[in-house]
């Protein structure tokens, strides 16, 4: 549980999903938004982390029974308990992230157009892939994650069509239960299989499982020409002038290309820094930003200011609810002319000139 602040402060309960608040991704982003609200708005933050899937939702009821001012459910798996509890506790305000509750009077449903942000990171991957093969690593095989896959695939294909090349997207999922969000070992196995098929950039939308991909990429570092499967070859070398970490040459040799991951939800670029030197090649290509931190913070702020409203709230490219990460860690991987191109694509999506699919 969080620390207790001033007696008059509003009490906010954060019920996390599978993976917990230190997953460096989805849940952690919500935790960071809550921490900022505690600092800026002088609210008390309490949290509940399930130790197994059967405990998901327990925190929601506990916070409601204690009369909290706002209860936030982090993840679609919390929707059922949020909806049931909200009907019973009409004086308590609720917010659910990544799902839509039919209980609109006192529940804010915070949803994201993940496909739009995924299109942009897919576009970047399509422009910079060195093999024409990229991977997608989903967590739980559900429609929510299919949106990430659909947008990513469409972005890759859009970029490759512009460049007159044929690209392949390899999709795999960790599993079909909530445990799929927290199984980095399985994600590592999938990453290895995608590498053997020639994937040089892999995008994970898998919560804590995505850390398995990140570990794998930093461990492997590259694809070697001798290991490429039949029909796959190096088609370009966009990173040849980027200084490599000291151990790259000995591990990879000359006839190789670096391998990259694309992070998700939070900015995970920094996790690709293998030698604590942002000036050398970073294995984090970019991250699809899903501003769960902003959604969490804004919900708390609305309660503090008395402007809270139930119902659907949509976060998209148009309101910076999703996007892509560019920072000191990956600036050498995405040149200025490509930034201009992806920004133009972003505007085309916002203006409806490009329609991004939601389904695979």
Residue ranges and their predicted role:
Residues 2-360:
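A residue-level marker of the well-folded mature domains of exported/periplasmic proteins
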């Amino acid at each position: 549980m969080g620390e207790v602040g001033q007696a008059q402060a509003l009490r906010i309960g954060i019920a996390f999903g599978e993976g917990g608040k230190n997953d460096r991704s989805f849940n952690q982003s919500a935790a960071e938004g809550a921490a900022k609200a505690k600092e800026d708005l002088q609210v008390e933050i309490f949290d509940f982390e399930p130790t197994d899937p059967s405990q998901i939702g327990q925190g929601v009821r506990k916070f409601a029974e204690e009369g909290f001012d706002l209860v936030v459910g982090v993840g679609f798996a919390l929707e059922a308990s949020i909806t049931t509890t909200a009907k019973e506790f009409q004086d308590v305000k609720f917010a659910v992230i990544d799902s839509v509750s039919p209980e609109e009077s006192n529940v804010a449903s915070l949803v994201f157009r993940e496909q739009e942000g995924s299109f942009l990171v897919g576009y970047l991957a399509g422009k910079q892939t060195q093999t024409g093969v990229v991977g997608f690593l989903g967590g739980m095989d559900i429609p929510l994650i299919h949106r990430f896959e659909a947008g990513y695939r469409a972005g890759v294909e859009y970029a490759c069509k512009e460049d007159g090349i044929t690209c392949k997207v390899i999709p795999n999922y960790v599993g079909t239960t909530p445990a799929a969000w927290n199984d980095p070992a399985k994600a590592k196995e999938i990453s290895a299989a995608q590498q053997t098929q020639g994937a040089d950039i892999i995008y994970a939308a898998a919560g804590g499982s995505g850390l398995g991909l990140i570990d794998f990429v930093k461990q492997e570092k590259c694809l070697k020409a001798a290991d490429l499967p039949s029909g796959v070859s190096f088609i370009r070398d966009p990173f040849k002038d980027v200084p490599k970490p000291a151990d790259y040459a000995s591990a990879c040799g000359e006839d190789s290309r670096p391998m990259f991951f694309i992070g998700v939800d939070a900015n995970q670029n920094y996790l690709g820094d293998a030698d604590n030197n942002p000036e050398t090649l970073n294995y984090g290509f970019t991250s699809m930003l899903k501003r769960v931190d902003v959604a969490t913070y804004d919900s708390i702020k609305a309660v503090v200011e008395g402007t809270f409203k139930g119902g659907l709230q949509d976060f998209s490219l148009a309101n910076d609810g999703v996007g892509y990460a560019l920072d000191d860690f990956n600036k050498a991987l995405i040149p200025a002319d490509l930034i201009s191109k992806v920004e133009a694509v972003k505007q085309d999506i916002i203006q409806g000139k490009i329609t991004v699919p939601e389904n695979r």
